[in-house]
Amino acid sequence: MTISETWLLPDGVADVLPEQAQVIEKLRREAIDFLAVRGYQLVYTPFIEYIESLSSLSESNQDLDLVTFKVIDQLSGRLLGIRADMTPQVARIDAHVRPVEGVARYCYAGTVLHTKPQNFNATRAPLQLGAELYGHDSIEADVEMVDVMLGLIENAYTLQGAHLDLGHVGLFRSLVKYAGLSKNEEHELSDLYQRKALPELAEFTQNLNMGSDFYALGRYASDLDALQAHLSADILKDAEFDAALNALKTTLEQIKNRWPALNVGIDVVELRSYHYHTGLMYAVYAPNRAAPLAQGGRYDGIGEHFGRARPATGFSCDLYALGANQFAEIETVVAPKGTEADLLKAIANARSEGLRVVQLLGNDDLSSIPYATHQLVLQNGQWNIEKI
């Protein structure tokens, strides 16, 4: 193996250098503080767990199982998984480790690992930050979570030009149930909706039970008024469909009231991981970026695998994506070598003010210190900081 080969990193992973690492860490700290004052308590979860725990969502979210790295535990011989998402771990905490009665709010930040990138040009080792609310199945809880997500993105990135998409899997799911479709028909419809293939959708729904309703769902996915006008009276009377539609309307109205300058849209056939989500879904997008800045939704019953099914809603984002193309201007104060008490006190005082101070070692000079922008100099018996 040549020396150059030892420099190579696997596809989809990268070093984060000081100019950007400083930005990322600032985002992380500010985000955790933002969530903390809203009642979201920080938890740390292990990087590895037995695969049975991490795969607690595998039946409802097979994508998660596919992106989870698996290794053999050298101590027990059991199969371990490297976390690809922290939500199953927080669900375990809520269900078993810290079974709070009533509403529980958690937040987290840490590296997760994926077997393959989740979208174009994405890292396989995102720095995932998220917040979750357990124990309340109300619209108010959903609105709170969307509101918190938007506030966090506004602080960490910007909402200027951003677009919020709202959807509700209950519309599609209740229509499928009402029509009595087979699993194959359900999967085919989901694929057509995801591809926005209206001509194919029109052809496929011609001989489908409730076909005109399924076509209307795709054709008028972004206009609730037009959608209602083209749906049959039968499905509009269905209790589950009506509840989902009203929940989406109410959420849309409340979010628009809270964020009047934000561009908010509807997409009732945005069915990413619809087997995993159980209600409202939301994602916020920035201009000229295909992947969402943050996304989330309702996933009731997530703790059932751990013996305690509870209502739950939450969102997550990748701090690396939020900090992309942002670079800190690093400033460093260079102090001369020496052990004099007044010099050491001057260095300590500067550091207490939040300044980065590096003291020269041995034969070092200014040229040996990266990012040297200022120096500590002795003038008339006083140590002063001067720009280089």
Curated annotation (Swiss-Prot):
Keywords: Amino-acid biosynthesis, Cytoplasm, Histidine biosynthesis. Pathway: Amino-acid biosynthesis; L-histidine biosynthesis; L-histidine from 5-phospho-alpha-D-ribose 1-diphosphate: step 1/9. GO terms for biological process: L-histidine biosynthetic process. Its main location: cytoplasm. It holds the Pfam family tRNA-synt_His. It is found in: Cytoplasm. One of its GO terms (cellular component) is cytoplasm. InterPro entries: aa-tRNA-synth_II/BPL/LPL (IPR045864), HisRS-like_core (IPR041715), HisRS/HisZ (IPR004516), HisZ (IPR004517). Heteromultimer composed of HisG and HisZ subunits. NCBIfam families: PRK12292.1-1 (NF008935), PRK12421.1 (NF009086). Required for the first step of histidine biosynthesis. May allow the feedback regulation of ATP phosphoribosyltransferase activity by histidine. Belongs to the class-II aminoacyl-tRNA synthetase family. HisZ subfamily. This function is generally fulfilled by the C-terminal part of HisG, which is missing in some bacteria such as this one. This is ATP phosphoribosyltransferase regulatory subunit. The lineage of its organism: Bacteria, Pseudomonadati, Pseudomonadota, Gammaproteobacteria, Moraxellales. The gene is hisZ.
